[in-house]
């Protein structure tokens, strides 16, 4: 099974991605986690990523594409994967399509978590304070929300046109969101998609 999870910063993608990955026994691949892990590295690429993330902008397509493509070739992705934080732009959609086509794979479903913008700001400020995440400052949050609206939101239209978009209300308790998410995926599976349940 090949899944994407999308939504604005603070929508709870990471939390839900872990639950989805466990349920379907596939790896959850987060570009954000991969890039944050580069903070402790002293390479030119790591320094570039650190500066970009501190400003609230996204890492350039070419760098992100290379990291994701290499990760999707790993053995644990043979049964499928859940991508969190990729693709973010239309060129990345095209790149991912090409990578998947080479392996005769396709996206089965794109999960979109919808959350009120005011709720998102509160979530991110709380997360930044408790987790010590430097990229969760008010300025960076505003920048990421604008970038999401300008660049990432149009991807939902692409996946909606392809018939693979599964929209889920991301407001509320984590367990309630998870329940809605699996109900939506089960409904999609019942409509003849390629989704197959896990544990």
Give, region by region, the residue ranges found by the protein language model.
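Glycine-rich phosphate-binding loop of ATP-dependent small-molecule kinases
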Residues: 1-199
